[in-house]
From Swiss-Prot:
Domain of life according to the entry: Bacteria
Subcellular location(s) of the protein: Cell membrane
Top-level taxonomy: Bacteria, Bacillati, Chloroflexota, Chloroflexia, Chloroflexales
EC number: 7.1.1.-
Similarity remark: Belongs to the complex I subunit 4L family.
Enzyme class, UniProt record, top EC level: translocase
Protein name: NADH-quinone oxidoreductase subunit K
Gene giving rise to this polypeptide: nuoK
Species assigned in the record: Roseiflexus sp. (strain RS-1)
Keyword annotations from UniProtKB, A to Z: Cell membrane, Membrane, NAD, Quinone, Translocase, Transmembrane, Transmembrane helix, Transport, Ubiquinone
InterPro entries the record matches: NADH_UbQ_OxRdtase_chain4L/K (IPR001133), NUOK/Mnh_C1-like (IPR039428)
Membrane topology type: Multi-pass membrane protein
Keyword Magnesium found: no
Length: 100
């Protein structure tokens, strides 16, 4: 059995990579992927804590987080496609206004 601390360490590492992706990258698609990485690392931590306590409530919360993340991706990608059609770029620095 893998110790709980390894899962928490992996979750922290993945969350750190996600934060670095949000802070360093300027591409909107990479920003979305970095946010999803952070959400999934939080899910890993929640499942790990639920497994350590032998409680199913953490897994239920993770299910709802996955549902909300899927809705966020659907709306975010739809907005990104609409912005790309008008601006012809996905660079966040160049997409500074919502006017056409």
């Amino acid at each position: 059995m893998v110790p709980t601390s390894y899962y928490i360490l992996l979750s922290a590492l993945l969350f750190t990579l996600g934060v670095a992706g949000v802070l360093i990258r300027r591409n909107a698609l990479v920003l979305f992927m970095s946010v999803e990485l952070m959400l999934n690392s939080a899910n890993l931590a929640l499942v790990t804590f639920a497994m350590a306590r032998q409680d199913i409530a953490g897994q239920i919360v993770v299910f709802f987080v996955i549902v909300v993340a899927a809705a966020e991706v659907a709306v975010g990608l739809a907005l990104l496609v609409a912005i790309f059609r008008t601006k012809q770029t996905t660079d966040v620095d160049e997409i500074h206004s919502l006017k056409g």
